[in-house]
Amino acid sequence: MIQYLKCDNGFKETEQYDFSCWINVVNPTKDDINELVSHFNTPDYFYEDISDIDERPRFDRDDGWILTIIRVPNRVRTEDNQDPIYTTIPLGMMLKDNILITVYYGQNNVISNFINWSNQKKN
């Protein structure tokens, strides 16, 4: 799923990209990746690296794009619905000129908490 988040006194989701948007991509499909590669000319292998659950934190450069991968907490429910288990998953941040794209697979509260905090802070 591709989200275009416009920064205007907090973050608001918008239908189309413009240069004031942050692009947040959650569990991208092949169609999502193809759209991002064709529209923004991002290196396609960046998405493969981010999708690797064992990918280590690092940064890379290709064709003007900078990729930074960090690991963020991921809450996983157990089968018996007891206390959740926490693991970490890769979060990729791609940056070129004024374009910021974040990509992750799985459930990530770091991004949603950041958006919610930013929206509450405006008040």
Which ranges hold each PLM region?
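Peripheral, non-transmembrane regulatory/ligand-interaction domains of membrane transport proteins
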Residues: M1-N123
